[in-house]
């Protein structure tokens, strides 16, 4: 009887050890896997006008007013745009190349000594780390070019400092959280003013790029979810994949999914910067308009990008 | 007596029947509502379930739904623990009846009407009944606390010598630990109730993990955060005490453990209650000071239990080898498993917490909040699931599993759950050893470990439930014997 019990234990432990070995044997994803190319027809220079006025802010739908008109980019800043900016900025000296990183000056934040607050003094801060294999930029002969195929994908692997510096270069800025949220949700006009997603009440796989949304750029069995070109979810059909036109009430694309977007607020008592919109790596619940994410301003990720406001 | 009435009487009035009923309810709820998130949503199962069952899921109400789901499952688990306590600890029969009746009415009302309200449209009378269910649970907790009153001379440990922890006057310190746990559970529940009443009135439900980085939290937000932490800790402490009773914890280790447990419970609670007072800045320090003796008490139980299993297993062998001792230790997977899970918990819950605290500046001060959320929700889901597996081990013994069935049941739970918990732990910590861009193959393996482990565990639980269900159809089934047993393993002290 005892021998039978021992065999049960042995069988189960062997299964466990085999599974553990299998896990150890798995290699990292191929970051350089080929990317499909589709023409979305997006005009990446377009801006959307957002008038002053009330909208429903947050999950609990508080009526809040923004007292100024502003504009936001219809599309996320692309790799192509960021490469052109870097070439300009390096030439004019607003950013510098140091040890395979792009750095630039930041005037610092007031430090209040709150719990968990990290000091951000005036100085040079990381904008982009050039040696990260997930970055789709190449630096050859003193100029930046985009890895072929990624030109109109959102700029990623960029820190909050790097995103802000891009906007600054053209006398623009990062949107505040409130501005971002109004641009995603639309005005308080009685027609679905409390929509949880920029396009409406429900989410389908062809509304946005999120985790396991089965778009042509993802392969969950190998490299996982990847960015889609900006404005991809515009109602066009790409091969066998039909998208739904998923712009926000003000006409902005990718306000849910694809990449988290840096916002410009510097909140007192904390060093964190806030991100909105969810990304290719999050479940649909994080694509709801009011969901916030935050990270240190030096954080960069293949799932983080930005757009500017003015 | 009518056959149906006999069976209902077993399910609703005998201790083992009540435990079986509550476990079946938890199994059904876990299986059903587990299909609405994670990989099940990813694979499209959620959409099918929602359509088939006619659920109404409003995006803005997700957090509220989850809060009600957590409470529904938690109340059933608290009911199971209450049944076990009333079956294990001496008390007046009237107290046992009132507690068992109260928690049964309480958890069933909470679960049924809470879930109907949350997932099938907001029908307000159901919300009222959900709150009423929680209130009945609270009242039953008060009665349980009274029933466990340790200064009742009737329950003193008498005689000149005893193997159990007691004061010089005979006060049973294990009973005092049960009492401390029950009393503080009742008080700590109000930290959720008061805050819940406020937020519920404005319907501003939030999940604690989503406000973790807010630099300024209100007192009521702190109250909610404190409540959820302490309630889970107290459920874990209750199960530790229950397992101690099951294994007849006694001797030197028990005499050291019980004062430590009482001290730990009291200080831990004071620390958590401190979060809503000016003591908030040092509350964490007080919590650590309370958690340490409580965990040491659990360590004493593990040492005692392992030693007991080895002694029993090598009885008759003159000089047992190391291998024979290990074989003896692992011979009974139910008793070994209940103790092993307490050890394993240190790798998947406490150890992770300590590691994160040590590397705070390079992890949480830099990582995005969503990564921090994964770590936070991961470690307390694991703790909850570990508690559930310990209950399953004890129930396996209670229901009389023997021989090969006991071996398969016990080892499957140990291996499957630990594979899943280890995978969750690696998933939480993955950013320390792999970048986001390169993580997918590893994530797939880990998700497979989690899904296979937990899914198979649910299959084991389902098999147990089906077996017990078929047994109910037998005229002279196991249920007829269990119906007659009032106590579980009450040990005369």
What are the roles of these predicted feature ranges?
Chain A
Residues 2-15:
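Bacterial N-terminal signal peptides that target proteins for export
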Residues 56, 138-293, 300-302:
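Functional-site microenvironments in short loops/helix caps that host divalent-cation chemistry
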Residues 41-124, 157-161, 257:
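A short glycine-rich, aromatic-capped structural motif
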Residues 302-310:
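Short, structured beta-strand segments at or near domain termini in extracellular proteins/domains
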Residues 97-143, 206-216, 220:
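Core domains of carbohydrate- and sulfate-ester-processing enzymes
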Residues 23-25:
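C-terminal motif of bacterial Sec signal peptides marking the signal peptidase cleavage site
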């Amino acid at each position: 009887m005892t021998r039978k019990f021992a065999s049960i234990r042995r069988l189960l432990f062997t299964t466990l050890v085999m599974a553990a070995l299998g896990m150890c044997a798995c290699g990292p994803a191929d970051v350089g896997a080929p990317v499909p190319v589709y023409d979305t027809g997006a005009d990446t220079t377009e801006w959307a006008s957002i008038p002053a006025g009330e909208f429903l802010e947050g999950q609990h739908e508080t009526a809040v007013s923004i007292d100024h008109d502003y504009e936001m980019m219809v599309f996320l800043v692309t790799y192509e745009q960021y490469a052109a900016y870097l070439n300009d900025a390096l030439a004019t000296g607003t950013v510098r190349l140091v040890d395979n990183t792009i750095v630039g000056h930041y005037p610092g934040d007031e430090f209040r000594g709150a719990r968990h607050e990290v000091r951000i003094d005036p100085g040079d801060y990381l904008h982009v780390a050039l040696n990260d294999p997930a970055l789709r930029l190449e630096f050859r002969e003193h100029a930046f070019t985009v890895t072929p195929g990624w030109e109109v994908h959102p700029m990623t692997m960029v820190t909050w400092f790097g995103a802000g510096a891009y906007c600054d270069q053209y006398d623009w800025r990062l949107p505040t959280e409130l501005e971002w949220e109004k641009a995603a949700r639309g005005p308080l006009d009685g027609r679905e003013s409390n929509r949880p997603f920029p396009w409406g009440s429900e989410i389908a796989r062809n509304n946005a790029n999120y985790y396991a949304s089965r778009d042509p750029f993802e392969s969950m069995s190998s490299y996982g979810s990847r960015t889609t070109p900006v404005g991809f979810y515009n109602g066009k059909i790409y091969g066998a994949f039909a998208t739904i036109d998923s712009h926000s009430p003000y006409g902005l694309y990718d306000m849910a999914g694809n990449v988290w977007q840096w916002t410009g607020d510097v909140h007192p008592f904390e060093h964190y910067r806030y991100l909105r919109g969810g990304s290719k790596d999050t479940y649909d619940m994080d694509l709801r308009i009011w969901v916030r994410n935050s990270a240190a301003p030096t954080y960069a990720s293949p799932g983080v990008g930005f757009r500017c406001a003015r | 007596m009518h056959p149906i009435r006999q069976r209902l009487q077993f399910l609703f009035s005998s201790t083992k029947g009540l435990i079986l009923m509550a476990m079946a309810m938890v199994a059904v709820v876990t299986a059903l509502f587990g299909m609405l998130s994670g990989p099940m949503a990813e694979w499209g199962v959620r959409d099918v379930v929602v359509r088939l069952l006619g659920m109404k899921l409003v995006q803005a109400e997700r957090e509220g739904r989850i809060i009600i789901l957590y409470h529904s499952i938690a109340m059933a688990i608290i009911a199971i623990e209450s049944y076990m306590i009333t079956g294990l600890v001496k008390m007046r029969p009237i107290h046992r009846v009132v507690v068992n009746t109260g928690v049964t009415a309480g958890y069933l009302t909470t679960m049924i009407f809470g879930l109907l309200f949350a997932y099938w449209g907001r029908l307000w009378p159901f919300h009222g009944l959900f709150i009423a269910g929680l209130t009945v649970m609270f009242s039953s907790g008060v009665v349980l606390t009274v029933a466990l009153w340790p200064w009742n001379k009737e329950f003193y440990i008498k005689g000149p010598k005893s193997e159990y922890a007691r004061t010089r006057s005979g006060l049973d310190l294990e009973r005092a630990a049960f009492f401390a746990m029950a009393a503080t559970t009742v008080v700590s529940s109000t930290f959720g109730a008061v805050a819940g009443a406020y937020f519920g009135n404005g319907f501003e439900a939030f999940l604690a993990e989503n406000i973790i980085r807010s630099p300024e939290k209100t007192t009521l937000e702190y109250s909610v955060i404190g409540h959820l932490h302490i309630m889970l800790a107290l459920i874990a402490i209750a199960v530790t005490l229950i397992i101690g009773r099951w294994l007849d914890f006694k001797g030197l280790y028990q005499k050291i453990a019980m004062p430590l447990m009482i001290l730990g419970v009291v200080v831990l609670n004071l620390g958590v209650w401190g979060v809503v007072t000016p003591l908030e800045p040092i509350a964490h320090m007080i919590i650590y000071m309370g958690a340490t003796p409580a965990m040491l008490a659990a360590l004493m139980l593990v040492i005692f239990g392992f030693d007991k299993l080895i002694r029993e297993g090598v009885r008759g062998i003159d000089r047992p080898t190391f291998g024979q001792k290990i074989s003896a230790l692992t011979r009974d997977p139910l008793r070994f498993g209940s103790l092993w899970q307490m050890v394993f918990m240190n790798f998947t819950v406490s150890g992770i917490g300590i590691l994160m605290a040590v590397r705070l500046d390079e992890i949480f001060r830099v990582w995005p909040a969503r990564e921090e959320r994964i770590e936070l929700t991961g470690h307390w889901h694991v703790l909850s699931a570990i508690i559930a597996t310990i209950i399953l081990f004890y129930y396996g013994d209670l229901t009389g599993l023997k021989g090969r069935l006991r071996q398969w049941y016990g080892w499957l739970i140990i291996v499957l759950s630990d594979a899943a918990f280890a995978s969750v732990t690696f998933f939480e910590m993955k950013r320390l050893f792999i970048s986001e861009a390169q993580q997918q193959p590893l994530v797939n393996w880990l998700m497979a470990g989690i899904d296979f482990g937990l899914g198979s565990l649910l299959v084991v639980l389902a098999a147990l439930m089906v077996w017990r269900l078929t047994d109910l159809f037998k005229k002279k089934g196991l249920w007829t014997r269990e119906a007659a047993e009032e106590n579980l393993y009450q040990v005369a002290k």
